[in-house]
Regions:
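Catalytic cores of the polymerase beta-like nucleotidyltransferase superfamily
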Residues: 1-364
Length: 364
């Protein structure tokens, strides 16, 4: 679809009618910006919009926002939240201290200059919500169409090291390859200043993304596979991950931990990941499966919850056995077990194994 058509569709989107009425007497230069435009071009639906508003002073903007009941999310950054809009004034940012808060922010009423602060060109495209005019000062549209990840401003990109990990998750989500000049810039950036939480928030997007190969290749080129996960990704592992069906955000770590025989508990702790990721080292791992082994796992969980159910063949086997959506729950006469303690547990386990064998014999 032509980008001009996207611009027209955005200008006609009824989601912006209320906002246009609010801004009409103040400006005709209000732009949909950032990921909202990128996603629109890619045909990805969104109900949350980032709007950048020009031709209004910070004082008048603050007054207007308070009048309409918008909630400020950082006055020094001129950003307000109104329903599903993030409304902001155009700005420039310059590094003035350490960490992600060490920035000086200045109001800027020039679209080209303001858009230069965007991390990658694919996020620098702007669409006027009144006219549908598309502003693409940095070639973001052509980069998006070519599936190319390219830094917008080489001079300021390194001001925030988080941009490196943002690049990784963009590669994973949108099937992008980093161009050579941008790669060289990113390779020089140390991410040691980032908190564990900021790193996790970007990694999580990678964990659930479709094109993991792109991100893994980029992580490897940046040396971040070793820094973050303690191993260097080899082509066999990258290919293996590419071929797997991933249904849970812990799937990548599950395969990483078992492929490289990593201490999963230590890795999860070092990355400060939430407890939900502990299943990546707690769940059983099988290189080859049989009906018997699947039924054993299904004693504890329906198999759709098992991270090892990662291929069409395994999914089909689970469904054929009737254990995809529900656990395998054979009738066990526990009253017949006359022992206690560990002996009781051992006998119960033996009876369950016998029940699995009986079930398979009946199936045959």
């Amino acid at each position: 679809m032509l980008v001009s058509t996207i611009g027209y569709q955005i200008s006609q989107n009824s989601d912006f009618d209320e906002l246009k009425k609010l801004l009409l007497n103040h400006t005709k230069r209000a732009y949909l910006v950032g990921g909202s435009v990128r996603d629109a071009i890619l045909g990805i639906g969104s109900k949350d919009y980032d709007i950048e508003i020009y031709d209004i002073t910070p004082d008048k903007f603050d007054a207007l926002m308070q009048e309409c009941g918008a909630v400020g999310v950082g006055k020094s950054y001129f950003v307000y939240k109104l329903k599903n809009y993030d409304l902001s004034l155009p700005r420039t940012e310059s590094k003035s201290g350490y960490g992600h808060k060490g920035f000086s922010v200045e109001y800027c009423n020039d679209e080209r200059i303001a858009s230069a602060r965007r991390d990658f060109t694919i996020n620098s495209i702007m669409v006027n919500i009144f006219s549908g005019e598309v502003l693409d000062f940095w070639g973001g549209v052509s980069d998006l169409m070519a599936k190319r990840l390219r830094v917008t401003n080489p001079k300021t990109f390194s001001d925030d090291s988080l941009r490196v990990l943002r690049g990784v998750q963009f590669a994973a989500r949108f099937d992008l390859v980093c161009n050579s000049d941008s790669l060289k810039i990113m390779q020089k950036i140390d991410i040691s200043d980032l908190s564990a939480n900021r790193i996790y928030l970007e990694l999580e997007k990678f964990f659930i993304a479709k094109f993991k190969r792109r991100a893994m290749e980029l992580l490897s080129e940046l040396g971040l596979d070793l820094k973050l996960f303690g191993v260097e990704f080899d082509e066999r592992f990258i290919q293996q991950i590419s071929n797997k069906i991933h249904t849970h955000k812990a799937s990548f770590l599950y395969h990483l931990i078992n492929y490289y025989a990593i201490d999963g508990k230590s890795l999860i702790s070092r990355l400060a990941l939430p407890n939900c990721y502990s299943i990546s080292y707690k769940q059983p791992f099988l290189r080859r499966v049989s009906k018997f082994e699947l039924l054993k796992i299904a004693l504890d969980m329906p198999l759709y919850q098992w991270l090892g159910l990662d291929s069409k063949a395994r999914i089909k086997m689970a469904k054929d056995l009737g254990i995809y959506d529900c656990k395998f729950s054979p009738h066990i006469d526990t009253a017949s077990i006359k022992t206690t303690g560990k002996a009781y547990g051992d006998e119960l386990k033996r009876l369950k194994i016998e029940a699995i064998k009986d079930y398979l014999n009946d199936c045959n």
